[in-house]
Amino acid sequence: MPMHESFFKVTKASESEFKALKGQSVSLALLQFGPGGINPAHIHPRSAELLFILKRQTKGLVHFQMNEEEEKDVVAVAAFGSANPGVVVLPTSLFGSGIDSEVLIKSFKTDNVTIQKLISANMG
């Protein structure tokens, strides 16, 4: 499936989307990355994750995935040991949630201008 630059799409299969999973304690997510696409840093507070890269490769650190290809798509499947793994997208949770700027300045050892730029970019 060709995708435009920086495209990232998640198709979930959890109890909410697929009723047959009710009581099974599993869920799945299909991840599609267009060239330059990124799955922002996040955690799953109620589950571990097993990620299979189905097409090409991505790079990941403490939980983000990114397609570094300039012209090719990446496709991955993430499987979870929970029917409801949840997801907390860290940029939005940290900079879009109303945490006091002084806390963020001290936590990230940076200045107010930088924090305000991050807050502005992550307000939903």
Question: Across the structure, where does each feature detected by a protein language model lie?
Answer:
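Glycine- and acidic-residue-biased ligand/ion/polar-headgroup-sensing regions
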Residues: 34-38, 44-60
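A short, N-terminal "cap"/entry segment at the start of jelly-roll beta-barrel domains
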Residues: 1-29, 40, 108-124
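Double-stranded beta-helix
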Residues: 62-124
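Core residues of folded domains in eukaryotic genome-function proteins
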Residues: 26-29, 47-49, 59-61, 72
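Structural signal for hydrophobic/aromatic residues that build the beta-strand cores
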Residues: 31-33, 53-56, 65, 76
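Generic detector of intrinsically disordered, low-complexity, polar/charged segments
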Residues: 17-20, 34, 53, 93-95
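Extracellular/periplasmic catalytic domains that process cell-envelope and extracellular macromolecules
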Residues: 20-23, 43-45, 51-53, 68-71
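Histidine (H) residue identity feature
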Residues: 4, 42-44, 63
